[in-house]
Amino acid sequence: MAYSDNNTYRHIHFAVMAIESGARKLGVSGKEMHDRLLKQGLIHRRLIKRYEDLHTQSLDWVADDISETLLNWEKEV
């Protein structure tokens, strides 16, 4: 596996874990969480773009962060 492929895999794996963990925090399905994050642009703008900052945190912390961010962004619309 090439470096860029491995790097992409790590980013996607992290995003999936964060989405599923955030969904559990909010009591919604993974699909609903994905769709809501996608609508707000948070999958790319928060989880993928900030991977280097976020992946060093605990999964519980990331789930809290992405859930809180989603709820705040949804309020602004």
Language-model segment annotations:
Residues Y3-K31:
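N-terminal acidic leader/helix
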Residues A23-T56:
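Amphipathic, hydrophobic secondary-structure cores in small proteins
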Residues R50-V77:
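Long, compositionally biased
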